[in-house]
Amino acid sequence: MDYQHIRYEIHDKIAVLYLDMKDKSANVLSQAMLAELEQVITELEQISGLIGFVMKSAKPSGFVFGADILEFETLTTEDEVRALQENAMRCLTKIETSHLVSVAILHGPVLGGGLELALACDWRLCQQTGRIMAGFPEANL
C-alpha cells in the first residue's frame, strides 16, 4: 500500500519506517500521520517472519515535533476533541501492544505527541549527531 507520510523498507526480519510528512519541513502527528502509522503497524504485523520495526524521521529537523496544533483550530465540539484524542491513543496502544519489537531512533526535537510516540516503543535510541530536546510543552498551551 502507498502512504503519503510514511515509507518503509524491510531488511532481513526488521522493517525500517521513515516518518516523512509530505510538504512539511518537520514531522507532526496529524490525524493523517496517526492513521497511516496505525495502518502500517497492522500491515507489518501480518508479515510472516518479521520480528520488529525501527521508526525514524526522514527529516533532518528532528523526530516528531508533537501534535499538529493547526488541526486543533479546526475542532469546534467536545466530541471532535475526544475523537482526536481517541485516534491518537489507539495508534499509540497499537504500537505498545504489538507483538513486534519497536525501536524509535531519535534526533532533534521529540516533543509532546512525538515523545509519547517514542515512549510507546519498546526501545528508544538517540542518534549521536546533534542534540535531543525532549519534553511536553503542551503543559503551556
Annotate the PLM regions.
Residues 47, 95-98, 126-130:
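Secondary-structure transition/capping motifs at alpha-helix termini
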Residues 1-56, 93:
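Conserved CoA-thioester-binding segment of acyl-CoA-metabolizing enzymes
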Residues 99-109:
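A short, small-residue-rich loop immediately preceding and capping a beta-strand
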Residues 57-90, 110:
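Glycine- (often His-adjacent) and acidic-residue-rich active-site loop
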Residues 91, 111-141:
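CoA-thioester-processing core
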Residues 19-23, 76, 138:
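Short, histidine-centered active-site or binding-site loop motifs used for metal coordination
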